[in-house]
Design a protein with these regions (language model features):
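Acyl-donor binding region in acyl/amide transferases
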Residues: 70-153, 258-290
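Acyltransferase donor/substrate-recognition loop-hinge adjacent to the catalytic core
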Residues: 129-216
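A conserved beta-strand-loop-helix scaffold within acyl/acetyltransferase catalytic domains
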Residues: 3-84, 190-275
């Protein structure tokens, strides 16, 4: 099975693979946003790989998201494998795709998130290990809309016996109407929405202090965060909050609305929650209370 890097001409076929499993498709603007990832360009990594058929058409795919990291002033790069789609008739193609992902040069880490029970053994066969060893399977959900969760389960049961692509034609069934409205946030003292991400902003000063500390950090400098928040395919604008003490930011939280497919209830996923040394307990407690 031939594996090669993704090309722009593959996007329609990759979206068709997403439809087959009931996953959201990317718009052309969304694919171009991924192409523009500055970290990916620095290490000249492809946006992913496809396993192709005899006519060189994508028949299976893994996408590649490169991020900058840093430790004590040393720049690092890591990559996340995502949207791994291997139809039943391409059984075995996952190994070549995962191997292409793992063989990328100039990276200190290669990983994937949210591996389900069906796909997890495939990663183990490729030499990947669950990490952290004791908490990798731990999730902490707060159910705030039980009715939406129940509707999601009912629709899954009703549509479980038909192909995901056919289920996709049923259309959206569990989107929460509240997502179309700007929420009135009740924020703890010291917590506020963060809107100024210019290089000379209070957030920029926070990032410079944070990146000087002796720990590995995902790069969230102002320019990177501006690019990250500009994803044209996001369901709604991410929630970015800061905690400040004595007029200086000492912690931030970033959360996004996630919805893996039309049958999933929307959820708010915390993807960043970090603070300066010495302010972790105070800032994380306040930000987490939101």
């Amino acid at each position: 099975m031939t594996v090669r890097p993704i090309r722009p001409s593959d996007y329609d076929a990759i979206n068709a693979l997403h439809r087959r499993v009931g996953w959201p498709e990317r718009s052309l603007a969304g694919w171009r946003w991924l192409e523009a990832n500055p970290a990916r360009r620095e290490v000249r990594a492809p946006p992913g790989w496809v396993s192709v058929d005899a006519e060189d058409r994508p028949a299976a795919v893994v996408c590649n998201f490169v991020q900058r990291f840093g430790h004590a002033g040393r720049p690092l790069h890591g990559a996340t494998g995502f949207s791994i789609i291997v139809p039943p008739e391409r059984k075995g193609a996952s190994r070549g795709l995962i191997r292409a992902f793992l063989d990328q040069p100039d990276l200190f880490a290669r990983y994937t998130l949210n591996a389900n029970a069906l796909s997890a053994p495939t990663y183990g066969l490729s030499g990947m290990k669950a990490w952290p060893p004791t908490t990798h399977a731990l999730k902490l959900p707060w159910i705030v809309d039980p009715a939406a969760c129940l509707r999601s389960r009912v629709w899954r049961a009703l549509l479980s016996r038909i192909p995901a692509e056919a289920a996709h034609r049923v259309g959206e069934r569990v989107m929460n109407a509240r997502l179309d409205a700007e929420p009135a946030l009740r924020l703890p003292p010291g917590v506020f929405p963060l809107t100024d991400l210019s290089d000379g902003s209070a957030y920029g000063a926070f990032w410079r202090r944070l990146s000087a500390e002796d720990r590995v950090l995902a790069d969230r400098n102002p320019a990177t965060l501006r690019w990250r928040l500009a994803d044209p395919d996001q369901i709604r604008r991410p929630l970015l909050l800061a905690h400040a003490r004595n007029g200086r930011i000492d912690g931030i939280a970033l959360a996004i609305v996630a919805k893996a497919n039309i049958l999933d209830a929307p959820s708010l996923e915390i993807i960043d929650l970090t603070a300066l040394e010495g302010a972790i307990a105070r800032a994380v407690s306040s930000l987490g209370a939101v």
